[in-house]
Amino acid sequence: MDANDKEIENLQTRIFLFLFVCITIRAYIAYYAKSVSIDKLPYLGYGALVIMIGFIYIYISGSRKTGAEVFGGKIWWDGLRPLHALLYGLFAYHAINKIDYSWKFLAADVYIGLINFFIYHTIEGNFTKIYNPSHRVSSNILISLSLSFFIYLGIIIFIS
């Protein structure tokens, strides 16, 4: 396997992990926040405060410009951390105050993350790179992207 094949494989792995692990977990948290009883909602709000503080700390300190999840590369969503912090903060405030639509801030976070993922990888030409018929796993990633798009579209419609 040459360096280009390794880069493509890493890119495919990153895309797969983002879509099927990160987004799935975040969508589930939004769904759970919608489904949980109003009396338990404040507990989720306090948890979201911890996450919000983490986003703010990481952004201000610059401590996570690169990471293992991008195989040592630049973390492209670093500039979105203040927005993630804001959305988690809004969720926390509303959840702690037992406002039933608080989950919508988490759903918005998932949606914004997914949109920015597609924008970033389109601008960078990454979808073109991974959809090269000469690469043996190109069709697998294309199927994964197509499937994930429809799954997440369904999740967003369902929780909205």
Each predicted region: which residue ranges?
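Generic alpha-helical transmembrane segments
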Residues: 45-56
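Alpha-helical membrane-associated segments of multi-pass integral membrane proteins
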Residues: 84-88, 100-126, 131-148
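Hydrophobic alpha-helical membrane segments
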Residues: 77-94
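Membrane-helix interface/capping segments
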Residues: 60-76
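Membrane-helix boundary elements
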Residues: 21-45
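Short, amphipathic, aromatic/basic-enriched membrane-interface segments that mark the entry/exit
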Residues: 9-16, 72-80
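N-terminal membrane topogenic signal
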Residues: 6-15, 135-141
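Juxtamembrane boundary at the C-terminal end of a transmembrane helix
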Residues: 153-160
